[in-house]
Amino acid sequence: GVGVVTILASGFSESGPQGAQREQQLRQIARSTGLRILGPSSLGVVHPRNGLVLTANAAFAEPDVPSGKVFVASHSGSMIGALVSRGKARGVGFAGLVSVGSEVDLSVGEICAATLDDPGIEGYVLFLESLRHGDALQAFAREAALRGKPVIAYKLGRSSAAAEMAATHTGALAGEDDIADAFLKGLGVARVDMLETLFEVFPLARKLPLAGASPACGQRVAVVTTTGGGAAMVVDQLGLRGITVQPVAGETLARLKEAGIPGSAGRVLDLTLAGTRYEVMKKALDILLQAPEIDMVVAVVGSSARYQPDLAVRPIMDSADHAKP
C-alpha cells in the first residue's frame, strides 16, 4: 500500500484555530494508520539521480536538473527551485531536494537522517523558517558531524517582520532568534546570512569541522594580503564572529624570510604589491598552509586582481587542493 503522502494544500495551523484542528486530525490519521505525511504546504520531492521530479514547482520544468552530492531540505517549496538555479550557476549538483512544508509528521531532521548513510550524499543544505522537532534535528546534525558531512543552514527570523512572515506561511513558531542561533551553533550547523553563501561555504565546510561538531575543531586563522585596508576589513569581520586572527609564529616568519618574503610579527601578513606576483603569493600560501600554528588561511586581494586575476587569484586557486582550507 501507500506508505507516504505529500500534501500540497495549505489552510492548516497557519490559518488559525480551525486550521490547527485540521492539522491535529492529520496527526491522528498518521498515528492510527502508520501513514507518513510530508507537508502540508509541501511542493514535493525531487531525486535528480533517478530522474524523479514529483513537485508542482515550475522551476523543475527546466531540463537537466544537475545531479550531485548535496541534499536539500526546505520549509519553503519555492526555494527548492531557487536553490537549484543558484546551484546550477555555480556547478553544484543535487542528490535530492525535499519541500518539507509544515512538518506535521515528517520533519527536516527525520528526513535528512534517513539519508545519512547514502555514499552519494556529502553534505546538507537547509532552508529553515523555524526550528520544529528539535530532538530530531539535533540527532541528525550530530550524526552528520560524526560522518564528516557538513550541514549548512539559512534560517529566517532574524527580524521580527521575517519571523511574523514565517509564522503566517507554515504556522511556524518564531521564537527568539538568538536562541535558534545558539542551538544551531551548538550542533555544528553553519548558519549563513545570504542565500548564495549556502553553496559558497560548502567547499570550506567539507575541509574543516564546523564549530560545535568536534572539540578538536581548529579556528586559528591566518590572513595574507596584498592590501592593508582589505585585510583590516576581513580581520574586523572575523572578530565580530568570535574568530581571532592567529599571529604567525617565529619559525614560520623565518621560513618566509628565507623564501624572500617580507613579514612581521603582526596578525596579518601584508605582502604589499609584491603579492601580486604569482610566485610571491603562492610561496606565502604554501608556507602558511604548512605552519602547525595555523588551521586555515584567508587570502585578501586588492583591486589589481579585477583586471589581472592571474596576478593574485591564480595562486589561491592553485592552493585549493591543500588539506587545509
Predicted regions: what is each one?
Residues 1-325:
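Catalytic-core regions of core metabolic enzymes
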